[in-house]
Amino acid sequence: MAFFKLFGVVCRCCSAKYRELWLVCERGNDARDNGYWFYRYLKEKHPEINVRYVIETDSADRAKIQALGGMVPRGSFFHYLAYYCADFLIGTHVQPCAPDLILFYHLAGKGIRARGKQVFLQHGIIKDEMEWLHRKNMYVDLFVCGAKPEYEYIRDTFGYPEHVPQYVGLARFDNLI
């Protein structure tokens, strides 16, 4: 991991490809939910943003990402490098865009994290207690909420600083319009 962190610093200095990078992902094997719709929005409406999407090369959804451009093969050398270079790690799961979710979850618990701001898009509206999403168990810089009651519940009970949970809606809802 230290190698990739160090190599990431060098790449950010030497290549614009790795500067101001936004990395988006869902589970790593699909592109159908909030991660995909957010990515598509950025590619179509904000082409000035250096954004890439992490997905497995044998995914049934790979063609959708390739059509938009910016595919990062999950688990590849480029994936590790992009993970450590990214300014924003945006995903629908814990440890957004991590090359190995379990490993990076445990490393984060010990304070070893990637440099990028972590954005948790999530999949849907939280209505029940989910202790693993509390601040003491998960580090995120932005926790996207899709409904006002959900936002209030997370804000009041999950232990995050006031600026972390934000009521902005879910990206996939935009596809319904």
Q: What name fits each language-model region?
A:
Residues M1-G28:
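Membrane-proximal basic amphipathic "stem/tether" segments
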